[in-house]
Amino acid sequence: MNLQNKILKGTTTVGIKVKDGVVLAADRRASAGYYVAHKYVRKVLYVTDNIGITTAGSVADLQFIYEALKYIYHRNSITGEGPITVKGIATWLANVLSSSKYFPYLVQILIGGVDDQPRLYNLDYLGDITEEEYTATGSGSPEALGVLEDNYKPEMSLDEAAELAKRAIFSSIKRDSFTGTGVIVTKITKNGHEEKEYYITKR
């Protein structure tokens, strides 16, 4: 199995950027091969109130990167350099991933947030970075992208984007055996984030 397949297997995450903010969403299943390792894993995390990430890939690598992102953000605030921007966070991480490409972190990460405007970035394990209007990662991304491409509109509201992200993940749950249990959807604005959880059946 190649590196890209290892990273893609086991999850679906979605990011959508609209004029009022950014929506991030992810399913909750963790799989090890064809085994469901955990049903309620958190794949939407927050660097600060108005910057979030979604995660796919090696749990150990993701934990290290998440703690590093929080450290960089808070270090800048403490040292008086001022809050780092969403673009700054994404660029810093892209440099870290690129410099480690011979011994790569096995991750695929979406970074979304709002400072002067909404921003959404997609980063792969080699440090390639793209700014997106909408995107999906993981083994269920083909199904999710189909829903996004058919329904995304730049002028849609944040609530409409959140509903679309939920639909995209649930579409993947129906078709992808590595995606499952439920969905976490968060709406991010410059004032913070609001998160909701949805499940196939009651917990």
UniProtKB/Swiss-Prot annotation:
Keyword check for Cytoplasm: yes
Keyword 4Fe-4S tagged: no
Catalytic residues as annotated in Swiss-Prot or TrEMBL: T11 (nucleophile)
GO cellular component: cytoplasm; proteasome core complex, beta-subunit complex
Main location: cytoplasm
Compartments where located: Cytoplasm
Enzyme Commission numbers on file: 3.4.25.1
Catalytic reaction annotation: Cleavage of peptide bonds with very broad specificity
Activation/inhibition comment: The formation of the proteasomal ATPase PAN-20S proteasome complex, via the docking of the C-termini of PAN into the intersubunit pockets in the alpha-rings, triggers opening of the gate for substrate entry. Interconversion between the open-gate and close-gate conformations leads to a dynamic regulation of the 20S proteasome proteolysis activity.
The entry's keywords: Autocatalytic cleavage, Cytoplasm, Hydrolase, Protease, Proteasome, Threonine protease, Zymogen
Proregion positions: 1-10
Pfam families with a match to the protein in the record: Proteasome (PF00227)
Subunit details: The 20S proteasome core is composed of 14 alpha and 14 beta subunits that assemble into four stacked heptameric rings, resulting in a barrel-shaped structure. The two inner rings, each composed of seven catalytic beta subunits, are sandwiched by two outer rings, each composed of seven alpha subunits. The catalytic chamber with the active sites is on the inside of the barrel. Has a gated structure, the ends of the cylinder being occluded by the N-termini of the alpha-subunits. Is capped at one or both ends by the proteasome regulatory ATPase, PAN.
Biological function: Component of the proteasome core, a large protease complex with broad specificity involved in protein degradation.
Family under the similarity heading: Belongs to the peptidase T1B family.
This protein's name: Proteasome subunit beta 2
Organism listed in the record: Sulfolobus acidocaldarius (strain ATCC 33909 / DSM 639 / JCM 8929 / NBRC 15157 / NCIMB 11770)
